[in-house]
Amino acid sequence: MTQPNPNKQSVELNRTSLYWGLLLIFVLAVLFSNYFFN
C-alpha cells in the first residue's frame, strides 16, 4: 500500500484545523462582544 502523496494529506489536515481555529476565534469574539455590549 503506497500513498501517492502523503504530504498533500497532511497539508489538507493542517488547513482543516486552521479553519476550525478561525471559526472558534470568530465564535468567541461574537460571544465576548455580546457580553460586553449588553
Swiss-Prot record:
Keywords of this entry: Chloroplast, Membrane, Photosynthesis, Photosystem II, Plastid, Reaction center, Thylakoid, Transmembrane, Transmembrane helix
Cellular component aspect of the GO annotation: chloroplast thylakoid membrane; photosystem II reaction center
Annotated S-S bridges: none
Transmembrane portions of the chain: 17-37
One Pfam family named in its UniProt record: PsbL
Recorded family membership: Belongs to the PsbL family.
Subunit-structure text: PSII is composed of 1 copy each of membrane proteins PsbA, PsbB, PsbC, PsbD, PsbE, PsbF, PsbH, PsbI, PsbJ, PsbK, PsbL, PsbM, PsbT, PsbX, PsbY, PsbZ, Psb30/Ycf12, at least 3 peripheral proteins of the oxygen-evolving complex and a large number of cofactors. It forms dimeric complexes.
Function field: One of the components of the core complex of photosystem II (PSII). PSII is a light-driven water:plastoquinone oxidoreductase that uses light energy to abstract electrons from H(2)O, generating O(2) and a proton gradient subsequently used for ATP formation. It consists of a core antenna complex that captures photons, and an electron transfer chain that converts photonic excitation into a charge separation. This subunit is found at the monomer-monomer interface and is required for correct PSII assembly and/or dimerization.
Identification of the protein by name: Photosystem II reaction center protein L
Gene: psbL
